[in-house]
Amino acid sequence: MRLTSQIVVYLLFLFVACMVCHGEVARLKPDARLLTSFYLLLSAGGAAGGIFVAIIAPSIFQTFWEYQLGIWAIALLLVLILFRDPTSWLHGAKPGLLAPTATLTLLLLVPKYLVHARILTIPTPLSLAYNFVLGLLIPVCIWFAFTGGPTWTRQRKFRWLEITAVGSFVLLTVALCLQIKANNIYTYRQRNFYGAVAVNSNWDADMIHVAYEFMHGRTIHGIQLSDNRKEPAAYYGERSGARIALLTKPQRQVGAMRVGAIGLGIGTIAAYGRAGDVYRFYEINPAVIDLAQGKKGYFSYLQDSAARIEVVPGDARLSLEAEAARGEFQKFDVLFADAFSGDSIPVHLLTKEAMALYLSHLHGPDSVIVVNVTNRAIDISSVVAGLAQEYGLKATLIDAPNRSGIYLRSDFVLLTRGKLLDIPEIQKAGHFMRKDRHIAQNRIWTDDYSNVATLLRFR
């Protein structure tokens, strides 16, 4: 129910925010002679907001602080509206208004502390409600703390209300400090137009460094061990579909291989490269490329690989289309599509047209496309199964369990026209995918149609 709770809370907040903002815009609308200036300023405000979110925020924030600030700003606006409205309950300052503030604040601090202490690695749905209530309480507490509140608190000497207000203000300040400190637990952090990336250091009980984790948003995209830096970890361990696809490929036994990868991460699959092999990565995010190439000093899979490494910056599909237009078909023996495990799904890489492009870049019928469908919120495997059926491909799903936090749970779908899936090791590890009710209920994604909502895991 975690995903369901998050969706309900987020949509509820969005509804409240839209009602407050649009309601105030409608209330403040001037008479006809000033409408031109009114709509001009309204348009300028929308443009300014877009510029702030798209350009300024990624430049000045290392994480998505504009979202938190937006929640607080909406709550502050709501308080100011209630203060100014003579008919509101806040304008009248009814007795007992702030009595439960301290208790409420402490209750709201609990989920924040659990996330900060990494007892909870994923924020609960309460986090959004926390930020909203925080924005509501801060101006009220400041007002009580520095003005003494309404006259009835001074006339009746309800000093406990002022004490509660000051105490709550202090607690809220601590909460803000915890929020800021929670974003400083990472060894390295950077944000650009494509999102926020971070590197986290893992230590054991004896404070010996164990591994570096690469995170994009809230999702781990790669792990490299400190004591065995050439060991593939995270989603590419010994029982993963990626490893099985690479090591059981007959071409590996007779000569060099050409391996392509849509999505670089930290380049973990390069650890399987041998002398003479070519591993070609397509990556759109320059920050990810810098980390994978070792420019920050955390990851070295690309540097340590015996294979020849090629990194193509830019959108993978556009790059592959440009190569095809030039007649430069890559003839991959194995093509990895590993761009679907994060917080957002690049839909254009999972369409019917995209699959046709991938197939055109394969070496032959025995080549294989390996799709990483590991995702805690979205069932991507049904889309891949539908594409396999559309193009007459054999498909098998290989899942590997989480082991010790270093080798993460992974789900890979192997697609081929040849006999690779008949190899006993793959048959033992995989589950052949056939048309089922999930595929039947979903249309094949195309460049003109996609529907992520139908793939959400509501559990």
Regions from the PLM with identified roles:
Residues 1-433, 447-459:
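Alpha-helical transmembrane segments of multi-pass membrane proteins
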Residues 292, 438, 442:
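ABC-family ATPase nucleotide-binding domain "signature/switch" substructure
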